[in-house]
């Protein structure tokens, strides 16, 4: 395209008159086709690109001796840019914007539901704390009951063992005291007998104590 636009000035001067008529006919033809296409049918962008490239390839109808040569390149490029923007709007920006809007609405709805569930969560947390407190009190009461029952059982066993041991000790002491008394009586009798024999041997026969 740049090579076509960079043709020598002589070729532009030679083809000045016939080129002046041809672009006008093509422009009129393209303007007649545009309403028929209605710019909504962008399924065939190749046709628009071919027409635009043909217009850009034609030499400009400029007179020799002017400082600047103006042609249809700038309007054609502007038209291509507008067509590209319309095509992107229909095929890219609109679907992507729709998806982003749906995603935004979904996120907002989820955030709203989460905010609405905050009261329910607080209620459930309070209920859980109440249940935990009740369970702790029940467990503590159960432990105290078991501890009291076990302590009572231990006290009963201790008292029974103590009473049994005390009875056995008292019985043993009574038996020992009885044995001691009988032994003392036997010893007293033996002492009296021995004393009598000693006195009998020591004292004369006619003396009695």
Curated annotation (Swiss-Prot):
The protein's matches in Pfam families, at most eight in alphabetical order, are given as:
ATP-synt_B
Q: Which UniProt keywords apply?
A: ATP-binding, CF(0), Chloroplast, Hydrogen ion transport, Ion transport, Membrane, Nucleotide-binding, Plastid, Thylakoid, Transit peptide, Transmembrane, Transmembrane helix, Transport
Q: Which segment is the transit peptide?
A: 1-62
Q: Which InterPro entries match?
A: ATP_synth_b, ATP_synth_b/b'su_bac/chlpt, ATP_synthase_B_chain
Q: What is an example of a GO molecular function annotated in this UniProt entry?
A: ATP binding
Could you tell me where this protein is found in the cell?
Plastid, Chloroplast thylakoid membrane
Q: Which PANTHER family match?
A: ATP SYNTHASE SUBUNIT B', CHLOROPLASTIC
Q: What does this protein do?
A: F(1)F(0) ATP synthase produces ATP from ADP in the presence of a proton or sodium gradient. F-type ATPases consist of two structural domains, F(1) containing the extramembraneous catalytic core and F(0) containing the membrane proton channel, linked together by a central stalk and a peripheral stalk. During catalysis, ATP synthesis in the catalytic domain of F(1) is coupled via a rotary mechanism of the central stalk subunits to proton translocation. Component of the F(0) channel, it forms part of the peripheral stalk, linking F(1) to F(0). The b'-subunit is a diverged and duplicated form of b found in plants and photosynthetic bacteria.
Q: What is the recorded name of this protein?
A: ATP synthase subunit b', chloroplastic
Q: Which organism is it from?
A: Chlamydomonas reinhardtii (Chlamydomonas smithii)
């Amino acid at each position: 395209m740049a090579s076509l636009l960079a043709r020598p000035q002589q070729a532009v001067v030679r083809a000045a008159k016939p080129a002046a008529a041809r672009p006008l006919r093509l422009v009129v033809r393209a303007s007649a086709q545009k309403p028929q296409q209605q710019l909504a049918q962008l399924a065939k962008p190749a046709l628009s690109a071919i027409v635009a490239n043909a217009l850009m390839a034609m030499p400009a109808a400029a007179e020799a001796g002017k400082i600047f040569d103006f042609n249809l390149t700038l309007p054609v490029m502007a038209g291509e840019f507008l067509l590209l923007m319309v095509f992107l709007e229909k095929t890219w920006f609109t679907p992507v914007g729709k998806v982003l809007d749906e995603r935004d609405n979904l996120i907002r709805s989820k955030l709203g539901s989460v905010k609405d569930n905050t009261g329910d969560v607080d209620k459930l947390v309070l209920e859980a704390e109440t249940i935990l407190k009740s369970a702790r009190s029940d467990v503590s009461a159960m432990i105290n009951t078991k501890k009291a029952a076990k302590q009572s059982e231990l006290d009963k066993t201790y008292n029974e063992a103590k009473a049994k041991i005390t009875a056995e000790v008292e019985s043993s002491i009574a038996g020992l005291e009885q044995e001691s008394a009988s032994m003392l009586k036997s010893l007293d009798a033996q002492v009296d007998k021995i004393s009598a024999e000693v006195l009998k041997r020591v004292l004369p026969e006619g003396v009695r104590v």
